């Protein structure tokens, strides 16, 4: 997301802001119905509502979507960040591409072992701890970035951000932007509803809550935290654009900002 902000500006924040809306849908509409029926997984719900064939088809679609759309992005971004911070390629004297592939494999294996050995409880505890660290650490990145932009002054950094290349702050995407404003309120809402309200990896955490109220609190708290994503993920991309306009790849915006 920081890389997209580096290239296209603030309009990409729509992906995160609309996620908060669909998390409210999860808390108020979907979760009560899931728990009322005693559903343990989303495929269980679909089998009860339709038939076993539907469940098998949806299971297959979920697996393909996770393997093709979600996991590659997570593993690639994690590998890119780790390689930029710890210079794995240089340390092992291998190419940049080989270092990324190595880290992708190691991250994937670590995730599998963690999920299998620790189970859902360990994942929930780790998510809570990681969430606190990500919010605190994530907010520090734009703060230090603005100080660097202002040559030691936070306020001068804000002034430069709002006056130099101010067009980057336009959050209303045009027809040629990656996220046009019309798409943010039509197709993107549907995509985010699918992800946040039916994705097994997301919903399973709320289904494992002690009660409906606790699950709703978790979903609504997540919605609040998603509203911070423009500051944590999008703003660093804009800051990186001001500081490093000659990056070979936009995806390097966030790791370069953190590393420097």
Positions of the model-derived regions?
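Short, well-ordered loop/turn elements at secondary-structure boundaries
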Residues: 108, 128-129, 136
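Residue-level signal for cytosolic alpha-helical hairpin/rod architecture
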Residues: 27, 107, 117, 199-203, ...
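Membrane-helix interface/capping residues of multi-pass secondary transporters
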Residues: 10, 52, 119-120, 128, ...
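Helix-loop-helix module between adjacent transmembrane segments
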Residues: 10-115, 187-195
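Hydrophobic alpha-helical segments of secondary membrane carriers
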Residues: 61-65, 126, 221-222
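Loop-to-helix junctions at membrane interfaces in multi-pass transport proteins
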Residues: 2-14, 47, 92-100, 132-260
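Transmembrane helix irregularities
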Residues: 116-117, 136
């Amino acid at each position: 997301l920081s890389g997209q902000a580096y290239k296209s500006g603030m309009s990409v924040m729509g992906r995160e802001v609309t996620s908060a809306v669909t998390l409210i849908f999860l808390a108020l509409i979907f979760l009560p119905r899931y728990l009322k029926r005693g559903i343990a997984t989303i495929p269980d719900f679909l089998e009860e509502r339709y038939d076993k064939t539907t469940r098998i088809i949806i299971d297959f679609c979920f697996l393909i979507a996770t393997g093709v759309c979600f996991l590659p992005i997570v593993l690639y971004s994690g590998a890119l960040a780790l390689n930029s911070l710890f210079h794995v390629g240089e340390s092992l004297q291998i190419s940049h591409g080989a270092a990324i592939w190595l880290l992708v494999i190691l991250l994937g294996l670590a995730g599998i072992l963690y999920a299998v050995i620790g189970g859902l409880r360990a994942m929930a505890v780790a998510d809570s701890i990681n969430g606190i660290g990500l919010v605190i650490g994530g907010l520090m990145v734009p703060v230090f970035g603005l100080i660097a932009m202002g040559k030691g002054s936070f306020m001068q950094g804000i002034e430069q951000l709002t006056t130099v290349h101010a067009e980057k702050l336009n959050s209303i995407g045009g027809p040629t932007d990656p996220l046009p404003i019309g798409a943010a309120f039509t197709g993107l809402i549907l995509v985010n509803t699918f992800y946040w309200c039916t994705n097994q990896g997301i919903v399973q955490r709320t289904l494992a809550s002690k009660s409906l109220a606790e699950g709703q609190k978790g979903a609504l708290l997540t919605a609040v935290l998603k509203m911070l994503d423009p500051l944590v993920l999008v703003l660093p991309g804009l800051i990186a654009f001001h500081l490093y306009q000659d990056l070979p790849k936009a995806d390097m915006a966030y790791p370069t900002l953190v590393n420097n």
